[in-house]
Amino acid sequence: MTSTVVNCVKNLRLAKGWTQEELAQTTGVSRQSINSIERNRYVPSLELALKFAQVFGCGTDEIFKLESER
């Protein structure tokens, strides 16, 4: 059994009315990185996950979840 990390970054970003570029500037990464994270093509570092939690005002467990695959 394997696990996949899924996230709510796009939903949280849209709820704040931010563009990918605005979130990228706020967190110090490129817009392309934000795009890759939102599309589940890239799992961010712990440091970036904590930055997301800080800017969104929630815990990392509310942003990132493990989904089990069989």
Model-derived regions: residue spans:
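A short, Lys/Arg-rich alpha-helix, primarily the initiator
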Residues: 1-15
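Residue-level signal for the short linker/turn that defines the boundary of a DNA-recognition helix
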Residues: 7, 17-18, 44-47
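Residue-level detection of the helix-turn-helix DNA-binding "recognition helix"
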Residues: 14, 28, 39, 68
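Alpha-helical residues within the helix-turn-helix
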Residues: 14, 25, 54
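Short alpha-helical DNA-recognition segment
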Residues: 18-36
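DNA major-groove recognition helix of helix-turn-helix/homeodomain DNA-binding modules
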Residues: 47-62
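Short, charged recognition helix plus adjacent turn
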Residues: 64-70
